[in-house]
């Protein structure tokens, strides 16, 4: 049986083994998937040992995505663009291919929710300029989204916008200068909801037709989504579906098929709300 793991620190609360257990049952692909705690500063050592002992693939979570980027032998375009790897496949020749499925997982969930529509150019506001944002920009730009990127430290947003401008239409703005208009989609990729804070953007950015998506998820509504609801937005979602979506695209890298994410999302949501 082929062996896969999720590597991180901490790792005990990772949902990945449960998600892949559900995917395995759904697809009929029999593979072993576990957790692997990696001591800080020892990613290369642990990863080398895992793959030398027969491991075929891995997911990588915080804080090792940049370590994985440097560790692998080859990179997909999306991994190269975002400078981080969350999925690894050992190829037949023994080399390691690094991918980043976070952004594609987001696209899959946004499409499931009808927050994005094929062929339509959407006006998208992305809040935050950290690693989470870096992982989602290329897939959004490939989907012809017109992106405004905002961040408390506007210089970080400007640097990121310049870096990704070769892939599509993207600009940076200070939060207080975000254009007073209703965006088609607002994505909170900042850490504000982790501390129950609200992103410092004008309330006028929200609207009845504005879809709002928080990369963070928890039982109940995040602070960002609650604030969006109070300001007229009714199409709301947290990032649980993105978590499942990025796992589904890891399966695609490993087995060339994408599992249906809906049943797994429903089960995880039920467990989360218990």
From Swiss-Prot:
Q: What is its EC number?
A: 1.1.1.25
Q: Which UniProt keywords apply?
A: Amino-acid biosynthesis, Aromatic amino acid biosynthesis, NADP, Oxidoreductase
InterPro entries, per this entry? Aminoacid_DH-like_N_sf, NAD(P)-bd_dom_sf, SDH_C, Shikimate_DH, Shikimate_DH-bd_N, Shikimate_DH_fam, Shikm_DH/Glu-tRNA_Rdtase
For this protein, the record's CDD domains field holds: NAD_bind_Shikimate_DH (cd01065)
Can you name a GO cellular component term? Answer: cytosol
Top enzyme class, one word, equals oxidoreductase
Involved pathway(s): Metabolic intermediate biosynthesis; chorismate biosynthesis; chorismate from D-erythrose 4-phosphate and phosphoenolpyruvate: step 4/7
Q: How does it assemble?
A: Homodimer.
Name by which UniProt lists this protein = Shikimate dehydrogenase (NADP(+))
Organism from which the protein derives: Proteus mirabilis (strain HI4320)
State the encoding gene: aroE
